């Protein structure tokens, strides 16, 4: 859930313009996000309140699904991504930003594939291995500690790659370091599927920029990708864009669970366990409460599934 929602403002890239008087006053433009490892080390375990399976992303709803069954919608998001990869048995698949591995576990439980799941947060590897203990998957997972923009893996060695609410942690409006490495690692004809939030317009109101800025800083996101810049970057690196699907309304039922889950979490931590939250955890909680309001800014922001295929 990251994630997984703001133009977090890469100093080296073109910035979204803030509608209204030109001023450097926006907090989103002046404060850096929390460090990724710090965020997930201090607040990562709180995702347990969101998903018993540690699905660290929003869900995908279809008309036949119960909108009150949050975990099923979270798992459905993973399956929607996998369906777009069009995998075959024996394929090697790359999970770019795996968290504690819920999507990877879902994939290998159902398909005879080999997944290399990458995270730069060390404790997530240990947790992923513990959560996989006792399962009997059809496929297999290699848990890899590393930076998904600079992996020591051979080129053209994967038949598919996906990233669910993790590409947002890469730098820049186009997420070029992320795209470049994915393109290097994919075999010709292989697909990349990205599920994430994207900025739709360059100009945004100042009040909306403030909300977005708080969320990006609190969720260790420099900025969310600009949709047009991201798709152009894919093409530039030899990944032909096959589909850009706005699924914002598909994730809305899961987003509506956020206030309930957050308030239950606060009640449990503050009132029952009498634990005070550190700065990273408070930032995460407040950002979660802002999320439904950010999602209403449909003119400026959307949640997309982007599918691209490496040219032959």
Task: Name these PLM-found stretches.
Residues 2-49:
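N-terminal auxiliary segments of SAM/dcSAM-dependent transferases
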Residues 58-60, 68-89:
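Conserved alpha-helix/loop element of class I SAM-dependent methyltransferases that forms part
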Residues 92-94, 100-150:
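Class I SAM-dependent methyltransferase SAM/SAH-binding core
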Residues 149-161:
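A short acidic, Gly/Pro-enriched loop at the edge of an enzyme's catalytic core
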Residues 176-191:
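A short glycine-rich, Lys/Arg-flanked "PGG" loop and its adjoining helix->strand segment in the class I
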Residues 198-221:
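Short, glycine-/aromatic-enriched active-site segment of Class I SAM-dependent methyltransferases
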Residues 222-238:
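Short alpha-helix
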Residues 245-312:
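Conserved Class I S-adenosyl-L-methionine
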């Amino acid at each position: 859930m990251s994630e997984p929602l703001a133009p977090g403002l890469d100093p080296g890239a073109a910035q979204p313009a803030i509608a209204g008087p030109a001023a450097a006053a926006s907090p989103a433009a002046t404060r850096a996000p929390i460090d990724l490892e710090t965020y997930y080390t201090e607040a990562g375990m709180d995702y347990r309140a969101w998903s018993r399976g540690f699905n660290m992303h929003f869900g995908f709803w279809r008309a036949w699904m119960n909108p009150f069954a949050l975990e099923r919608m979270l798992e459905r998001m993973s399956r929607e991504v996998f369906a777009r990869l069009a995998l075959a048995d024996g394929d090697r698949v790359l999970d770019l930003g795996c968290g504690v591995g819920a999507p990877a576990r879902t994939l290998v439980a159902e398909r005879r594939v080999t997944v290399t799941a990458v995270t730069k947060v060390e404790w997530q590897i240990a947790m992923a291995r513990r959560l996989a203990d006792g399962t009997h998957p059809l496929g297999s997972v290699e848990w890899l500690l590393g930076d998904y923009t600079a992996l020591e893996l051979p080129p053209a060695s994967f038949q598919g790659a996906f990233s669910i609410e993790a590409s947002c942690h890469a730098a820049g409006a186009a997420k070029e370091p992320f795209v470049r490495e994915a393109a290097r690692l994919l075999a010709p004809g292989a697909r990349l599927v990205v599920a994430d939030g994207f900025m739709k317009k360059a100009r945004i109101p100042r009040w909306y920029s403030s909300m977005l800025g708080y969320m990006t800083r609190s969720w260790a996101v420099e900025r969310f990708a600009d949709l047009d810049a991201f798709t152009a970057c894919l093409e530039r690196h030899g990944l032909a864009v096959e589909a850009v699907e706005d699924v914002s309304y598909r994730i809305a039922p899961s987003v509506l669970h956020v206030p309930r889950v957050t308030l239950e979490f606060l009640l449990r931590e503050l009132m029952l366990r009498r634990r005070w939250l550190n700065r990273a955890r408070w930032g995460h909680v407040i950002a979660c409460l802002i999320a439904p309001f950010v999602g209403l800014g449909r003119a400026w922001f959307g949640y997309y599934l982007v599918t691209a295929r490496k040219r032959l």
